């Protein structure tokens, strides 16, 4: 399952919508469920919208929390966005109590996950993961992140190892994956471009 925060853009007027989505298929064609964005899609047609993945997460809770951070009151008031309320999920407000419960759930899940220890950072050499305490020496050949060698795709094929903390950038035509401490190249901005095919599905640009 993929969990991410995305940005949908109206290619006609440039207006945008930010939301969170969880899916087994990155090319599912999902553009958003908010009232305003749905009305816009109905008016302009799906082919006049594009979706960019802003950031990927390991859990749905983490994605919700990031979404809550970036959908600010200023953004909601802006005429450049379709978002109507904090949270961005169909205009539903996430209360303080709900956010607290999600944080607690996320913390427990992390604490109880096999091979993980709170307070430590995961490093990988591409085949093996180790957890290092703050201040401890990182072995040669290891970099910050986690590899998932046994992860399966929907078709049962192995997925290329992924590294936690990396992020996508694009220059309007090309996508690049940047390491956690990497520098964004000139002319590139954060986000991953996704193109829509003739069937309405998204594919990598």
Swiss-Prot record:
Keywords: Endonuclease, Hydrolase, Magnesium, Nuclease. It is an enzyme of class 3 (hydrolase). Its EC number is 3.1.-.-. It comes from the Viruses. InterPro entries: GIY-YIG_endonuc, GIY-YIG_endonuc_sf, SegE-like_GIY-YIG. CDD domains: GIY-YIG_SegABCDEFG. Its cofactor is Mg(2+). SMART domains: GIYc. One of its GO terms (molecular function) is endonuclease activity. SUPFAM superfamilies: GIY-YIG endonuclease (SSF82771). Signal peptide: none annotated. Residues 1-84 form the GIY-YIG domain. Probably involved in the movement of the endonuclease-encoding DNA. To endonucleases of group I introns of fungi and phage. This is Putative endonuclease segE. It comes from Enterobacteria phage T4. The lineage of its organism: Viruses, Duplodnaviria, Heunggongvirae, Uroviricota, Caudoviricetes. The gene is segE.
